From Swiss-Prot:
Organism from which the protein derives: Mycobacterium sp. (strain KMS)
EC number(s) given by UniProt: 4.2.3.5
InterPro entries, alphabetized: Chorismate_synth, Chorismate_synth_AroC_sf, Chorismate_synthase_CS
UniProt xrefs under HAMAP family: Chorismate_synth
Protein name as catalogued: Chorismate synthase
């Protein structure tokens, strides 16, 4: 079973990602991870941290000479600002007198509405929001992206699967409603300042961000991930936790600030009649074909051979420059929420993180289905399965009967 976890704090020495269960033989380099982390820093409306934040990547284990070894893979992402935070975020005890002289160590007692501050302070018994926000910060997603890079490499090399994303809308911008992008479109999408797949949608998104900047506010939005090349049959209908859509939804909802997920046409499907809600099946020369993909590539919890489409709704960033009303947890008095350096909009980057979680879930499902200790073995199993599926396709079966 493919498993992953991360460790570390936003201003700590480093973040660490550990991925266990990956097969041996997958080509992977530090530059592969660096390229994905640079994509995570993309986007119009990002804060000052993105301008100087450099992800110092170190492969700690599980990879040798650019190839995975089959054991747990550990990846470290160093914090270039660590010297500024070394005392405040030290793991070992520090003299209170020394801490008292450091301004950035001042207790944060005014929780931000919409953030983990309030519930985290009460749940864990903290009198300072610092321990909460350090781990709850979206900076943690850098470690996930590192782990997801391994999953992406496996999916591409074992099955020929490609994962792309684009921004549908930001704030109240006019949503993109055209055809989904193809893998070849990813470079053009990343070249867009808001990772849009349409020039008109891009202009509308930028206008929204500019307005929010002027007003001292923040914005959320909607992103879509499209996955091509998936075979029929990943996931299962046999139980709820084996359904691929439940796994995808859980993984995407686990991303900071994500408040909603839909597969395919999702909530729009609920407003349609059944006669126009589903993807009708027709005979084709090499099996069945469909003229629509409203289901988004999943039926009954399983991939159906069409592109997978997953959308995620990101709420506006909770660190709002104009400061929201809150209560000081020490005094109980009315206050304004703490404000630290933050983005106006991080939706373009969220698309990359959603790609990551989708890739991890799909890699896990593929390894459950096809197994193997090495990439070569997994490929052999994939090819055998694809031949068996092709033989069961109506057109293929009919030809076999006719020739027999």
């Amino acid at each position: 079973m493919l498993r992953w976890t991360t460790a570390g704090e936003s201003h700590g020495r480093a973040l660490v990602a550990v991925l266990e269960g990956m097969v041996a033989g997958v080509s992977l380099t530090t530059e592969d991870i660096g390229a994905q982390l640079r994509r995570r820093r993309l986007g119009y409306g990002r804060g000052a941290r993105m301008k100087f934040e450099q992800d110092e990547i170190t492969m700690l284990g599980g990879v040798r000479h650019g190839v995975t070894l089959g054991g747990p893979i550990a990846i470290q992402i160093g914090n270039t600002e660590w010297p500024k935070w070394e005392t405040v975020m030290a793991a070992d005890p520090v003299d209170p007198a020394e801490l008292a002289e450091i301004a950035r160590n001042a207790p944060l007692t005014r929780p931000r509405p919409g953030h983990a501050d309030y519930a985290g302070m009460l749940k864990y018994g903290f009198d300072d929001a610092r321990p909460v926000l350090e781990r709850a910060s979206a900076r943690e997603t850098a470690a996930r992206v590192a782990a997801g890079t391994v999953a992406r490499a496996f999916l591409r090399q074992a099955l020929g699967v490609e994962v792309v994303s684009h921004v549908i809308s930001i704030g109240a911008s006019t949503p993109y409603d055209g055809p989904p992008p193809q893998p070849a479109d990813l470079t053009a999408i990343d070249d867009s300042p808001v990772r849009a797949f349409d020039e008109a949608a891009e202009k509308s998104m930028i206008a929204e961000i500019e307005a929010a900047k002027r007003d001292g506010d923040t914005l959320g939005g909607v992103v879509e991930v499209v996955v091509s090349g998936l075979p029929v049959g990943l996931g299962s209908f046999t139980s709820g936790d084996n359904r691929l859509d439940s796994q995808l939804a859980a993984a995407v909802m686990g991303i900071q600030a994500i408040k909603g997920v839909e597969i395919g046409d999702g909530f729009e499907t609920a407003r349609r009649r059944g006669s126009v809600a589903h993807d009708e099946i027709y005979p084709g020369p090499d099996g069945v074909v469909r003229s629509t993909n409203r289901a988004g590539g999943l039926e009954g919890g399983m991939t159906n051979g069409q592109p997978l489409r997953v959308r995620a709704a990101m709420k506006p960033i909770s660190t709002v420059p104009r400061a929201l009303a809150t209560v000081d947890m020490t005094t109980g008095d009315e206050a304004v929420a703490i404000h630290q350096r933050s983005d106006v909009c991080a939706v373009p980057a969220a698309g990359v993180v959603v790609e990551t979680m989708v890739a991890l879930v799909l890699a896990r499902a593929a390894l459950q289905k096809f197994g193997g200790d090495s990439l070569t073995e997994t490929r052999t199993n994939v090819e055998s399965y694809l031949r068996a599926v092709a033989a069961r396709e109506p057109a293929t079966a009919q030809r076999a009967q006719a020739s027999g």
